[in-house]
Amino acid sequence: MTLSEIQRTLEKCETVPTRSLGQNFLHDQNLARWIVGCLQIQPGDHIIEIGPGLGALTEFLAPHDIRLTLIEKDGRLVRHLEEKFRSPTVEVLHLDALDYDLRQAWGKGPVKVVGNLPYYVSTPLIAKFTSALSPASRLVLTLQLELARRLNAEPRTKDYGAMTVCVNRRWEASFLRKLPASVFVPAPKVDSAVIALERRPADRVRPLDESLFDPLVRRGFSERRKQLRNLVPELKSRWADVAAALRVPETVRAEELSLAQWETLTDIARPSAAQSGQEMFDVVDECDRVLRAEPRDIVHVNNLLHRAVHMLLFNSRGDLLLQKRSIWKDRNPGRWDASAAGHLDSGENYPEAARRELREELGVEAPALERIGKLTPCEQTGWEFIEIFRGVHDGPFAPASLEVETVAFFNREHVKAWAAGSPQDFSPVFLLCQAFL
């Protein structure tokens, strides 16, 4: 939009930019076109635009063969957006982007996010749209220059901090360009920058207990001037060995550790788990009768018939709890699945395994579980007899970090429509379990 178009539109809407909403409207059309180009849009993408305002970016998004969701907090501008971009593939939501339900975005195509973020809420918005529940694969954001530099900072610099480390663990941050205040109206008091965040593929994310990683990093940066050993007292008695493993002096501070060193420190800080032997499964015949016990690897490599359980937990409103499998799983990594699932150990029965898996994967004691069905072995089940259990539980849950990316309750009808349109988002076994919803 040009300056004159912005002025006419504001007059038509009988409004003026509101400082409390962080409204600074982009008036450089070439720049708007360039920002949209940075999204690397593909046909069928679902683009979420945060704070479209008068539609400077939306004008260049709308012509694409995409689904478009516009999230606008200012009710004065919502009607303008609805009228200007009316289309079956465009949805305008009148709400704060912090209140947007990320679950709504699943099942609508590959998600990318764009927006000129209000500076006062940029950090929580980035945290939200880069969270484990977010379906986004790429974000192109206009931010305050200071924040953009923090996301792209290097160790041993003043901009490097907890946010740098935590975001860059799962996302590749790229500083695209600096924007002068003059390209906005009204001009903000600070310069801005455009950054891109690209989700890292699984082979570029080190397996790690992330329930320990984020708190450890934030604790380390909580007092930047302090030596790190004074902020992790649980490691202080063996700090000389820790520093040697990290290849740093014992006087190291948080800002001197790279992402890889923070990951190593997390592994060191993780309590040692009791060593267990090779998992043993019962091999069964076509009638599910136990023949013998074999190690897990032998069972899987040779496609021997064995046993497993899948649990479908519902909350008191009837919504279904789904888990997103860890990206490090050897089978169906990163896909959505039943609330909890797992193999039977040798000598274990189905109900015992169901209760154990709920404890291990979700950190809850089993509610009253009802057996609702059984799947027979086939390639899709991984040659498993699978008993399916149903239960009611409202949480809270404590997902096992190395096993589960996240969990969330979804409306059952949403899940059915999502699975029908995007079956690749789910494990093959869950698609079979749908018959029991």
Regions found by a protein language model. Give the residues of each.
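Catalytic cores of RNA-modifying enzymes
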Residues: 1-215, 244, 264-267, 271-273
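Active-site segment of metal-dependent pyrophosphate-handling enzymes
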Residues: 51, 303, 317, 355, ...
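General small-molecule cofactor/ligand-binding pocket signal
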Residues: 91-93, 174, 370-372, 408-410
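An accessory alpha-helical subdomain
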Residues: 193, 197-199, 204-241, 249-260
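Acidic, metal-coordinating catalytic segment for phosphate/diphosphate chemistry
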Residues: 276-310, 316
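Nudix hydrolase/Nudix homology domain
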Residues: 295-297, 334, 373-437
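A glycine-rich, hydrophobic loop/mini-helix early in the fold
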Residues: 308-340
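Helix-adjacent hinge/juxtasegments
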Residues: 330-364
